[in-house]
Each structure stands twice: as C-alpha cells, then as structure tokens.
Swiss-Prot record:
NCBIfam families: PRK00033.1-5. Binds to the N-terminal domain of the chaperone ClpA. SUPFAM superfamilies: ClpS-like (SSF54736). It comes from Bordetella parapertussis (strain 12822 / ATCC BAA-587 / NCTC 13253). Signal peptide: none annotated. This is ATP-dependent Clp protease adapter protein ClpS. GO terms for biological process: protein catabolic process; proteolysis.
Amino acid sequence: MSSTLDTQHDVVVEKQPARTAPPPMYQVVLLNDDYTPMEFVVKVLQKFFGKNSEDATRIMLQVHHEGRAVCGVYPRDLAATRIAQVSQYARARQHPLQCIMEPA
C-alpha cells in the first residue's frame, strides 16, 4: 500500500490495492449417447481435459451409467472453448458426443 500527501489540505490518502473478483466458474458436463464408443470418450477426456487413464475411465463410466458427468470446471470462455473443441473433434470422427456448460 502506498501513501500520497494532498498538499492543499494536508491529508494523507492511502491507495488501496485493486480488488477483482474471481470469474464465475462453469462446469463442462459430458452427456451420454447410444453411439459414441467408450474408448473414444476416454480419449476425449484425456486429450481435452487432461485426465489420466484411470480418471478418464471413471468419468466415462459415470457418463455411461448416470447419463452425464462433470469433466472439469473452468471460467466461462475456457469452458466454451473446451465444448467447441470436443464437438468439432467428435463430429469430424462421425460421433454424436455432446457436452454442455452449467454454472458451477
């Protein structure tokens, strides 16, 4: 914190550091479908969400059994980017895999 002297009024004004709120976070949720192979889902989780083999398999099984699972939690722009990347990658390989973004 720094101080400055207001010479006209002989008052010391202390500057407060700027405070910024953390950005709102969003979870990326992978949705189940009847056509995308489980191995492909594991690959997507590893490639786009940085999951190791064990975590990717666990999330894939949750998607398979419960219909959905959270892949990660990110600021809005990064979550939207991950969704676009997954969608483009899946479509290019003829898979209907979908994910959505929800407030965390």
